[in-house]
Amino acid sequence: MLNPKKKRKECYFAGILAAAAAISLLSGCCGGTPSLEEALKKTASYEQTSIPSPASDSLGGQWTVIALARSGEEAEDGYYEKYRANLEKRVKDQEGVLSENRYTEYARAVLACKAIGIDPSDIGGYDLGKPLDDFEAVTAQGLNGAVYALLSLNADRLEIDGELEQKYLTYIVKQEKPPGGFSLDDSSDTADVDLTAMTLQCLEPYATEEEISAIIDRGVEFLADAQAEDGGYEAYGDKSSESVCQVILALSTYGIDCNKDERFQKKEKGL
């Protein structure tokens, strides 16, 4: 099993890139300032230098492809083509099976394909979105499986299966922990920062629904209460920049200014 601390470190810069891009959409959250623009450019350059040939897995550059495409920063010539070639090779080599039990592999690939404007339904002759139709297999992985399946369904809203969408939404809503937030651990009564932030991101298209709006509000309050005194977050006993990035993404999704909202200012220190 992959050490969770190592995984968080590997995803760190991709998370920063995505979070910085999200912040830039908020005029009151340092958007458009030279320092933010410089951070975007430096991180985008670092990611592409560190991962010159992005692979189709969570640690090999797939998150980089997603974050880079969404950031608005220009990719190097042929960068996305390399990703597609690597993805097609993996799909063909494995006869369309990215994983037997981790269906986030399919959701992440669909998100990456849609982010760079290619059709995930024909990659090496395989439809990468098809496995996500298997509700039982996806949710067997847990809450994160359903969250990323719903995110991938909503990535472009084209030909979305409304019945399947509702099944995932209903499943996710039922996983809320009292008094708010979400966790990967079904047996836990305590919510988790990362899973709560991820789940809030996938609930945004439904924010006008009264029940969902209340869940979102409770989730945001949980994230505010879980924030450390230095303005950051901890995971596995260590300070976690990835958790900070996930929270920034979640807040930005709802137009919440992470640098001005009083709930996220701890001793004059914010995200």
Indicate where each model-derived feature is located:
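Ser/Thr/Asn(+Pro)-rich, low-complexity disordered segments
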Residues: 30-33, 71-74, 82
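C-terminal motif of bacterial Sec signal peptides marking the signal peptidase cleavage site
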Residues: 25-28
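Long, well-ordered core segments of solenoidal/helical folds
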Residues: 35-54, 78-98, 120-140, 163-183, ...
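N-terminal amphipathic/basic helix or basic patch
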Residues: 31-42, 59, 63
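Sec-dependent N-terminal signal peptides
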Residues: 9-22
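N-terminal secretory signal peptides that target proteins for export/translocation
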Residues: 1-9
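An alpha-helical repeat/solenoid feature that recognizes helix-turn-helix modules
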Residues: 52-75, 97-119, 138-166, 177-215, ...
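N-terminal leader/targeting segments and the immediately adjacent pre-domain N-terminus
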Residues: 2, 14-15, 30-34
